[in-house]
Amino acid sequence: MRTPSDKLDIMHTALNDINNEVTRAVKLHGPLNSLHEAYSVILEEFDEFWEQVKVNPKKLDLDGQVKRSANMEVELIQIAAMCVRTLMDVEI
């Protein structure tokens, strides 16, 4: 079970990773131009996360489970980063 300190460490790491991903995505792709574009980008990232969720970890070896967990973390960071980009780029 995660302690409050563990959760705080995870939050700090995630926020740093989100910041890095926002910076990388803006440099690579430029700003989002509309809510429709933002929705499609967020949905694409969410679908990539969902693909990992649907994998039965009991059918994976240890290496596969580790890769799945890492992939889910990456996708969650990307989802959060695209939400931040939407707040930055699109007038709501």
Where are the model-predicted features located?
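Flexible "arm" and connector segments at domain edges
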Residues: M1-I92
